[in-house]
A protein has these predicted regions:
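Eukaryote-biased recognition of intrinsically disordered, low-complexity regulatory segments
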Residues: 1-19
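Residue-level signal for inorganic ion chemistry
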Residues: 5, 33, 69
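Short secondary-structure boundary/capping segments
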Residues: 12, 44-45, 63-64
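Compact, glycine-rich, soluble single-domain proteins
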Residues: 17-48, 52-55
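C-terminal structural segments of small proteins and small subunits
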Residues: 57-89
Length: 90
């Protein structure tokens, strides 16, 4: 079966693409998709324990089973900001 993989931010930079199509065996999980990407793009492996995943635009666990035609998005950890809230009065 085939899934569309979407990568964001640093993950996109490391893979050199924001969208990929990959074959996954029947019964495969989001983690299987990720492991295939990490094998193809070894620099992604460093993010394995920190990524978030969404299947068909709903956050999911890496253990979620994916199906033919699914959209599987991987997002790196979010960081940044000044640490101070801006209430719009400045």
């Amino acid at each position: 079966m085939r899934v569309t993989v979407r990568l964001f931010a640093r993950l996109r930079e490391l893979a050199g693409a924001s969208e990929l199509v990959r074959d996954v065996p029947d019964g495969g999980t989001a983690l299987d998709v990720w492991n295939g990407l990490a094998e193809e793009f070894p620099a992604l492996a460093a993010y394995t324990k920190a990524i978030s995943v969404a299947v068909n635009e709903d956050y999911a666990r890496l253990t979620a089973i994916v199906h033919d035609g699914d959209d599987v998005a991987f997002l790196p950890p979010v960081s940044g900001g000044s640490g101070a809230a801006n209430d719009g009065n400045e």
